[in-house]
Amino acid sequence: MTDWIMNAGMYAVTPEVEAGWRDLVERVARDAGVTLTYVPDLWTQSLDEICHRSDLGAVHLCGYTIAVKHAAVIAIAAPIPRAIWAAGHAVYRSDLIVRKDAPYRTLEDTFGARAGWTATHSQSGFNAFRHHLLAFRTPQRQALYGEVIANLRSARNILDSVREGHIDIGPVDAYWHMLITRHAPQLTADIRILASTEVTAMPPFVAAAGAPTEMVTRLRSAFTAAATQPWFKSLGDLLLIEGFAQPAADAFARLLEWDREAKMAGFELPA
């Protein structure tokens, strides 16, 4: 019998927030009548290892990873960020951040400086950034930045790299940015948002492709009904979410469109 696991490490910006996510998913699982085991150190494994685990029960995963078929998983439900730009939908975007004392007033002002991105499997840290930059390229200006630091791996590393002056601009998941600004404001006090990308489907909780249909259905129903439960309000306030929504069947198609557009333009990597 499979011991199904859960994890929300993508958005565990502080120990308090991770505890909140754990509490929420445990309550959802209880409401669903499903037994899930929380694995706190899941993201110490490589993405490839996580994606190919057959015991994923409710684990947060980037939609771009799903879209490019790197992970054979079933999308269960995605959080609805408590943000004006989300407008009550399970969507997110990337904030392009710089230091508050940087001279830049527009994105174009950063061209020629040093940028960074996280990983080629990331929507918020790579694909969205690349798509946003695509509109600024011209035949005469194929590369926008003087230097690009690749594979910084995480939003936290982008944030720290901007704070410490290792890069001048970089993309961070806007929902992650909201959370860390609320719960660790000292880390973003010297940072400002210069621009933001278009919104796309929010990273969902997923189950392994071989997970029982009944289990997935129960979890999906419990996630989407969570906001109506008496226990939800305090956790929603902590995690800055309004509830959960089931992703549409084509929720991540737009991510692939952005990927194709960039590659057809010869823009394989943000530059």
Language model: regions and residue ranges:
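N-terminal hydrophobic or amphipathic helices and topogenic motifs
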Residues: 1-66, 70-71, 91, 231-271
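Periplasmic-binding protein-like
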Residues: 2-5, 9-10, 78-93, 185-221, ...
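Bilobed "Venus flytrap"/periplasmic-binding protein-like clamshell domains
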Residues: 5-28, 88-158, 233-242, 250-252
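Generic non-transmembrane alpha-helical segments
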Residues: 27-32, 109, 218, 222-231
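Short helix-initiation/N-cap motifs at beta->coil->alpha
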Residues: 36-50, 81-82, 140-160
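Acidic, polar ligand-binding/catalytic clefts
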Residues: 49-109
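A ligand-binding cleft/hinge motif common to bilobed small-molecule-binding domains
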Residues: 60-72, 134-135, 163-164, 168-188
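Hydrophobic, well-ordered secondary-structure segments
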Residues: 127-141, 151-163, 190, 197-199, ...
